[in-house]
Swiss-Prot record:
InterPro entries, alphabetized: CCDC82, DUF4211
Biased composition (Basic and acidic residues): 16-27, 68-89, 111-127, 215-225
Residues where Phosphoserine is found: 170, 194, 305
Alphabetical UniProt keywords: Coiled coil, Phosphoprotein
Coiled-coil stretches: 204-232
PANTHER family: COILED-COIL DOMAIN-CONTAINING PROTEIN 82, PHORBOL-ESTER_DAG-TYPE DOMAIN-CONTAINING PROTEIN
Biased composition (Acidic residues): 38-67, 191-201, 249-266
Domain of life assignment: Eukaryota
Polar residues bias (residue ranges): 92-107
Name this polypeptide is given: Coiled-coil domain-containing protein 82
Amino acid sequence: MVHVRRHETRKNSKTQKPEQKSRVDWHRTKRSISQLFDSDEELDSNEELDSDEEHDSGESIDSDEELDISKKSDINELPEKETELKLIKVESQGSNSKHLTNTSNSSADEEQLKETKHNDLPDDEAHPGQAENHHNRHTGQILEEDMEDEYIKPGKRKRLSSVMYDSDESDDSDILIRKASAKHPRRVVEDECSSLEMEQETPEKSSAARKREYHQKLQELSERSRQRRRRNSGRNFEDSEKDSCSGTGEEDEDEDEDDYRYDEDGDDYMIDDFVVRNEEGDDENSNQQGENLTTSQLKLVKQNSLYSFSDHYTHFERVVKALLINAFDESFLETLYAGTRKKSYAKDMLTSLHYLDNRFIQPRLESLVSRSRWKEQYKERVESYSNLNILSKSPENCVCQACGLHRHCKFSVHLSGKLYNIRTMETDDFMSHDKQVFTVGRICVERTRIYHKLKHFKFKLYQDCCLIAKPEEVGDEQVKDTVKRVFNHSKERGWIRKKYDQLQNFLNSADYFQDEKF
């Protein structure tokens, strides 16, 4: 072994011999060392490319760290080898025998170096003969190219350096190394996670925002219901609507004042019917609103005579009761049709009266007239006179005064009676003794009989009620009690049922009346 002290003593000796040229080829040694560095860098770059395509970010960065460590070890080995070569050069100035031993040691070191190269380098660099041939062909340019290649970094290494730079900026190196390697896929996953978090946050809105939305929706709903009520109130049921509006006007105003509450800013908003305080109250409010709509619809149905859930006999009983009340109090029907009476029984009576006129009688009258050729003058005469008397006479071929056709006429129609109001049943004494006589045929006389009975059925029924009420009138008894007593007595006797059956016969006769044959 060569020691440093021996080196210093030999260098400071008095007798110095001229330096002999070393047998070591320094150009070859430098080329081999530079070739070693280049091969290491190429090998590391190839390994990095494979590792980046196949492995994740952690493995790629670990390989970079191992590459840096191997570089540092190679650089550290370089000065040691140079010191050994310097020792060989100094010892060559001594005896030839010692110089030969040093050169032999250096040759042994070179053999060991070649063996390590053979194990570490790929197959093309394990054979020094091929490498020498390659470098001999480029002897003039190889040193400069090697020096330049030492400072050139491949593109892949630049990407890795940027990744390491991004990872150095973070606080937690382990998490960021994983994050930096799988760039695009990890970002997509993170975006999905963030979108899921946003979707989870969307249903978790603040209570104020939800109340605002509910408030806006319910305000729109209330406005629609108001418009619907306005449209319904402006239809063809003016009389019934006047009753309901005038009777419940003050109550509705009080309810509206209770339903509305004012906030600090003075804005009015509805509380009791529309504002939802929590999510569980949605179903309750919707059910309450549905009930309110159904009750309002039922109210309109009751007020409308075209829609009723009562049977025909119930309507007829109410009509009889109304006529009995009017027999004791002649102003009852007038006030009932005027809408001044607000009680429920009065409204039911008004509905039944409309039902009798508009559903029972009027359609049959229109059907009888539409299937005939009656003159308008004859029709008006039949409607104006309440009394009808049909007499037979000697037949004659003449023109029928009802239809204007040439017929075999053998009947004379006598019309008489006072004119009356079809609603209030008040009579008019103007020309009370006037009479009208018409000569008609067989078919027209039958049509006249059915038409007159249906047209004046309610007036005839009122006259019968007046005949029943007069003997039952008591001075001290109230009208309500008297009407109740007379009505129950008439119902027990079967008089109401008898009049109802009579009406049904008239209706059936009008329905099955044969058409006039020409």
